[in-house]
Amino acid sequence: MEFRKVFDTIPEQFDRYRPRYSPELFRDLIACAGIGPGKSVLELGPGTGQATDPILRTGCDYHAIELGEHLYEKMRSKYGGYPNFQIVNGDFITYDFGNRRFDMIYSAATIQWIPEEIAFTKTFDLLRPGGTLAMMLTRGDYRTPNEKLFQRIQQVYAAYFRPEEEYAHGAFRYDGAVDYGYVEFEKREYAGQRVFTAEEYVAFSGTHCDHIVLPEPYRTKFFDGLRQAVLDAGDRIVFNDTYILYLARKPLEAA
C-alpha cells in the first residue's frame, strides 16, 4: 500500500490524535487570503478535518478532495450539515475539476504526498489570478522538554523500529513554488504545545505512516517500549510544536 493511503486504515485514531493548528495561524491565513463569504476554497486531503473548521466557518464556498474512502466518510459525517461544505472522494493528481477555479488552495501536511511538478502546476492552474496557495505542517520537538525520555525513546527505535519501507522525510521543496510561477513566497511560524500520557503517545505515534505499517515481530515490542518509556518518566511527554505556514500567490497577470 502507498504511504499516502495508509492513513485511511485508521480514521478514528487519526481524527483523535493528529495535531491541529494554532488559531493565530488561521487568523493570519484568512486575513492574508481574504477568505470569507463569496470566496471559493479547496483543501487538499483534509484527512478528518485537522485544518477544516476555521476555514469552513468563514462562510466561504469550501471544497475538499480526499483520497481515503474512510477519511472521506468521516469528513462527511462531521461537516455534511454545513451548507457551504462540499467534498469528493478522489485523487488530486488525476481528478478533473473542469472549469472550477479557487481563491485559495490549501494543504495541511498533504501536498508533500504529491509529486512537486504536479502539485505546483495543477494548483497554479486551479487558482484564480491573485489566488493564494497555503501549505502548513507541524514540527514537534520532544527532545528539548524531555531530554532523558528522548534518549530512552531513541533506544526503543534503535532496537525495534524496522519498517519494511522507509519514509523519506523532507523531500518536498515548499519553496519550489516559485519555480512554477508563484510569487510572494513566505514562511511563517507559530508556537504550540501538546502533552501526552503514555497511552496517548503510543496512539499518536501509531498515526505516522511508517509506524502504521510496522510489521511483527517488531510492532508489539516497539509500541510496548514507547509506552513503558513514558510510564517510567511519570506518564507524561511534552511536545513543543512549531506550526509552519508557507504562503505563495498566483500573480494577477500570470505569464
Segments from the language model and where they lie:
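Conserved class I S-adenosyl-L-methionine
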Residues: 1-36
